[in-house]
């Protein structure tokens, strides 16, 4: 029993989003981009901070210029854009806008991005979990449909490509998504769009109950700045802007995103390198005895090793200097630089000998 009687009892069992348990020389656990911004970009941003951003003034609360820049990049209109302190804030706002007051729960197909369930639970929103196919990690559409019949689902949460497994939605899954009733909000999380190059954005006009989430933390290398954006129906974006906390993005973060979009071609050129490294890692992992690795459309690979407890393998790898993430009963390895990937493979071979 909790000594703090004012606390909600259900929150006592809520586990926070966890990262790698200890520092590692090579951080391949968080799906970050392995290359920092070019020095010239960072110097320009530093100069902006020094000369152009008054510390005593609040930042732009409405993100007007940023919405225009993002809309131009994404192929949308500014009124279709809402910005958050990372996609996490947007997810939380979407759940507040749809599910609070006993209006329904969310459907998640696991394994998937854990923050959907964590944020829903923190708000007292029911979470209905449906397991994915254990071989392909495809959605079990029959069980998803059963969940819709048996529970008052208000939001369906889909990550495309999925994290941690890396697979994109299939044609059959898209057909199911397109058939969902308009009273159900469909969150299509495209955090890894720049790697997969697949987007549902062209179909948004046909589906006012769809909303796309993206982030600048991955391919644009701005994880430290925590900026995500939603693309959807203007009325939904207006509600999200009303729900979010005021001044949710720092002035420096807004300038960083503006710079990233101005130099998008240069920054995104290195995505090709990551995809090439991903395929090389995939082939190398396939050749190791006992390793089952799944193909990926993102900047990470998901795998399991026969005869090994994945958490024990994570710890052994960590001790040798490579941080990986344990999730969903397996390990997720972020694609790093060629040197980081080489060291990761060497260390794994050493462990498996």
From Swiss-Prot:
Set out the biological process GO terms recorded for this chain's protein.
L-histidine biosynthetic process
Top-rank taxon of the source lineage equals Bacteria
* InterPro entries the UniProt entry points to: Aminotransferase_I/II_large (IPR004839), HisP_aminotrans (IPR005861), HistidinolP_aminotransfase (IPR050106), PyrdxlP-dep_Trfase (IPR015424), PyrdxlP-dep_Trfase_major (IPR015421), PyrdxlP-dep_Trfase_small (IPR015422)
Tell me its EC number(s), please. Answer: 2.6.1.9
Residues with the modification N6-(pyridoxal phosphate)lysine, per the entry, are 218
Q: Does the keyword Transferase apply?
A: yes
Give one GO term, molecular function aspect: histidinol-phosphate transaminase activity
Q: Please list the reactions this protein catalyses.
A: L-histidinol phosphate + 2-oxoglutarate = 3-(imidazol-4-yl)-2-oxopropyl phosphate + L-glutamate
Does this entry carry the keyword Phosphoprotein? Answer: no
Pathway terms, separated by semicolons: Amino-acid biosynthesis; L-histidine biosynthesis; L-histidine from 5-phospho-alpha-D-ribose 1-diphosphate: step 7/9
Pfam families xref list: Aminotran_1_2 (PF00155)
Reported cofactor(s): pyridoxal 5'-phosphate
Keywords of the record, alphabetical order, are: Amino-acid biosynthesis, Aminotransferase, Histidine biosynthesis, Pyridoxal phosphate, Transferase
Family the UniProt entry places it in: Belongs to the class-II pyridoxal-phosphate-dependent aminotransferase family. Histidinol-phosphate aminotransferase subfamily.
Quaternary structure note: Homodimer.
- The name this protein goes by in its record: Histidinol-phosphate aminotransferase
Organism of origin? Synechococcus sp. (strain JA-2-3B'a(2-13))
Q: Taxonomy-wise, where does this protein's organism fall, top ranks first?
A: Bacteria, Bacillati, Cyanobacteriota, Cyanophyceae, Synechococcales
